[in-house]
Every structure is written in C-alpha cells, then in structure tokens.
Amino acid sequence: MNMYATLILALALSMDAFAASICKGAALHRPHFREAIRTGLIFGLAEACTPLIGWSLGLYASQYIIEWDHWVAFTLLFILGCRMITESFKTKQEKKCESPCRHNSIVLITTAIATSLDAMAIGIGLAFLEVNIVHTAMAIGMMTMIMATLGMLIGRYIGPRLGKRAELIGGLILIAIGFNILFEHLELFMYAK
C-alpha cells in the first residue's frame, strides 16, 4: 500500500472519532485546549492500537472477529448515545452531584474504543496484504489525533450556540454512527451471500 492510500485510509478511519469529538466538545461548553489535546491523544492511541490488534488477530482468527466487531461497536455507541441523551435532560443540580473527571474519562475511553473497532477490522484485512503495519497504524493514529483535536475545538464553538441540545444531538449522532457501522457490515454480509 502506497503513502497516498495509507493517508486516505487514515482519514477515512478518523471520521467517526472526528464526529464523536465534535459532539464531546459541544457538550462540554468551552473545553480547554488541553482537554482537546487529551481527547485527540486518547482517540489517536485507540485508533493506532486497534489495527495492530486486528492485524495480529487476522493472522489467527479473522473469521470469528469479523462476525462480531460491528455488534460490539454498535452496542457501545448506542449505550453511550442513550447516556448522552439522558444527560441532556438532567438539571444542573443533578449534574453537580456526579464526579465529572471520572465520568468524562470513562465515557471518553469507551467512545474511543467503540469508534476504533472499525480500524481493528481493517487491521484484520491488512494482515493479508503486503503492508508495513507499524507505519500504517502510526499514520492512522496521527490522523485520528489531529481530527479528534480539531473536532473538540470545532465543538467548542458549536456548543454554546446549541446549549443543552448539544448533548442530545451528540447522543443522537453517536447512535447514528453505531447504526451506520451495523448497517455497513450487515449490508456487506448480505452481498456476500
């Protein structure tokens, strides 16, 4: 795989993280630049590791993983989306009672893992090609880090304009991403038969 194909693959795989980080930035109402960098690093790390995991597993058990990865991604994104929608209806007093640091880290890491499962599936496929998996994974991770950081910064300016609706819209977008992943895999499965 040449450099251009690798960059296009990296950009395509970073789009879910970009959309999810826009939602997170909008829901946080003016996150700091440090939070945007942190989000980018977490998404980038997850997106860089999962193709390596997929590539390793592709050498051994590709058939079993491909059958379930889309269901796992859909379930995680659906649950996170529902949680964001529920959060959008909470009052400020109810939100103050929660530990925001712990809550945000758990949700952020779970979202990063859920949006990177498609990269694991790609890694499985890359196991059957002549490709330098380390360079490819680094390109995917770097592109995702950049796109997720940009997404947070874009969300920072969208959030105040949307108010409480930002979390509601973010939750709906995460659910839509989950359904998109599920339908793409089910559609491919239908054509394979």
From Swiss-Prot:
The keyword NADP does not apply. It is a multi-pass membrane protein. One of its GO terms (cellular component) is plasma membrane. It is found in: Cell inner membrane. The keyword Transmembrane helix applies. It comes from the Bacteria. The chain crosses the membrane at residues 3-23, 41-61, 65-85, 106-126, 133-153, 169-189. It holds the Pfam family Mntp. GO terms for molecular function: manganese ion transmembrane transporter activity. Keywords: Cell inner membrane, Cell membrane, Ion transport, Manganese, Membrane, Transmembrane, Transmembrane helix, Transport. Its main location: membrane. Probably functions as a manganese efflux pump. Belongs to the MntP (TC 9.B.29) family. This is Putative manganese efflux pump MntP. The gene is mntP.
